[in-house]
Amino acid sequence: MNSSLILANFTSPAVLCFLIGVIAALVKSDLRVPPQVHETLSMYLLFAIGLKGGVALSYSNLAEIFYPALATLSLGVITPLLAFGLARRIGRLDSLNAAALAAHYGSVSAVTFMAALNFAHQAAIAHEGFMTALLAVLEIPGIVVALMIAGFLGGTKTIRLRQVVHEAITGKSVILLTGGLMVGLLADRGGLAAISNVFVSPFQGVLAFFLLEMGVVAASR
């Protein structure tokens, strides 16, 4: 990675907005995005990413996706188990807190994914269009494994796998990502073109504004 590419990343509108948010928090500014607006922006970005991934997925075949999806699923199971063990042994955390930490490591940050995808796009780095589908795949097993660990070791021996899976797959982020994927995958091209002015063109601007708030939150914590 050359210096010009690094500079281009740090001077991108999204990163600059994040830095403005950090500075605003450090100087004790009253800059805040209302919770309802923050929630709306988050939902918009997740659905827009899913939509874009679904369109790319429609041009892929099953053979291209199978092994990456299998590897992603395996990582989603192995990572929280390793994180739990390290949190217990090295971090000296109790079972419930270690399981909560394991869920964070086993799951995935959609915001980080969006920023990475945005960087790859701006840097003209080739990447598979079905990566968004893998994001949805990775979101589920980490949460399921962590909830099962918390249930068994936290004293809830009667934990039901069906209930755990239901909680994981009905989460807001998973519904929005997979919903967007299905729309992008199944909708006709004319219909997608009709909504592109809402879910494609404004994406970069919405992401930049969203990261402004994330900068405030990150610096405040």
Feature map (PLM): residue ranges:
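Juxtamembrane membrane-water interface segments of multi-pass membrane proteins
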Residues: S29-L31, P35, V55, G91, ...
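Alpha-helical transmembrane segments of multi-pass small-molecule/ion transporters
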Residues: M1-A24, P35, L62-P202, V206-M214
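Active-site-flanking structural segment that lines cofactor/substrate pockets
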Residues: L45-L62
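Short, functional N-terminal and low-complexity linear motifs
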Residues: G50-V55, L81-L86, M214-S220
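Metallocofactor- and cofactor-centric catalytic cores in central/energy metabolism, strongly enriched
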Residues: E39-S42, A48, F84
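Residue-level signal for pocket-adjacent positions within structured domains
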Residues: L26-K28, R32, K52, A193
